[in-house]
Amino acid sequence: MGLRAAIIGAGQTRFGAVPDGPRALLRTSVDRAVASVDRGLDRDRIGAAFLATLGFGGWQIGNAAALFAEEAGIPGVAAVRIENACASGGFALQAAVAAIASGATELALVAGLEKMTDVSSARRRYWLGVSGDTEWERQAGLTFAGVYGLIASRYLALHAVPPEALAEVAVKNHANGALNPNAHFQKEISREAALAAPRVADPLGLYDCCPVSDGAATVLLASAETARRYTDTPVYIDGLGAASDHLAVQERPEPTRFEASRRAADAAFRAADCRPSDLSFAEL
C-alpha cells in the first residue's frame, strides 16, 4: 500500500460502433462504477475527477472536463482532462493517485472515453496522425500503422522471428474477446484467417491493428485508510510508473525497444518493492 490509494469500484460500457453519444457513454460508465461499490458511495464526497480522452469528432474538445463532471453527477468538482494519446488513461490514473496520496482528496473519479466511429475517416486520420511526430513522420506520409509496421519488420529481422508468428497474437486476442461481453470483437478467428487478412502496413495485417471504437470506462479510487468503508475487497495500488520517450521513432537509438515502457515498469516495480518474477498475471 505504498501509494496509499485503492480502487473501490469500476464500470464500463460495451465497446464497438454504438449509437450512444459521448455524454451517454460517460454517464453509463460512471453510474456502473458507483453502483459497483459494495457499501454505496455518496458522489458529493468525490473531490477530484480526471478524464482521459483524445477528443475525436470535436466533442467538447476545449472543455471536456466540465462536461465530464456534469455527466458524472458531480458538477463543481475540480475536473481535469488528460490527453496523452494511447497513454491517456494511465496518466489519468496516476494523477488521481497523486491527488489522493497528497491528501488533496479522499475520493477521486477517473474515466476514459472515446467516440470514434461516427466521424469521417479523414477526421479520424487527422487526430491519429497528430498524435505522432508531425514535423518528420507525418510529412513523409507515415501513419501510426506505418510506423509500427516498420518497427515490426525490424523486430522480426533482428530476432529471426517468422512473420507468421504475429498471427498467434491476433488469435489469442480474439479468443479473449470472445469471452468478454463488453469487447468490440466477440468471436474467435483462426490462424489461417489472420494470415490471409489484407495487409495494412506490412507485416501488419487487418487483425494485427486496433480498430476505431466507441466506449467508456471508469474507476473510483479512495485513500487506503478509507477504502474499507466502501468495500471489503479494495484493490490497492502498490506501484505506479510513467515515462516518456522521443516522439519521432527515428530519434530512438533502437526503435524496437520501448524505453518509456521499460522506465515506467521499473518505476512501478521499485514503488511496489517487487520484481517481475513475483507476478502471477500481466497485461500489456
Where do the language-model regions lie?
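Conserved active-site "lid/cap" helical segment
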Residues: 1-87, 95, 155-162, 184-193, ...
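Condensing-enzyme catalytic core mediating Claisen C-C bond formation in acyl metabolism
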Residues: 1-23, 27-28, 134, 157, ...
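Conserved catalytic cysteine-centered active-site region
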Residues: 2-3, 55-107, 115-147, 185-211, ...
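Structural motif
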Residues: 5-6, 47-49, 78-80, 106-109, ...
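A cross-taxa feature marking solvent-exposed loop/turn segments within ectodomains of secreted
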Residues: 44, 103, 228-230
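Short acidic/histidine-centered micro-motifs embedded in hydrophobic/aromatic stretches
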Residues: 52, 169-173, 240
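Active-site-proximal alpha-helical scaffold in enzymes
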Residues: 84-114, 145-179, 219-225
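Active-site pocket-lining segment
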Residues: 284
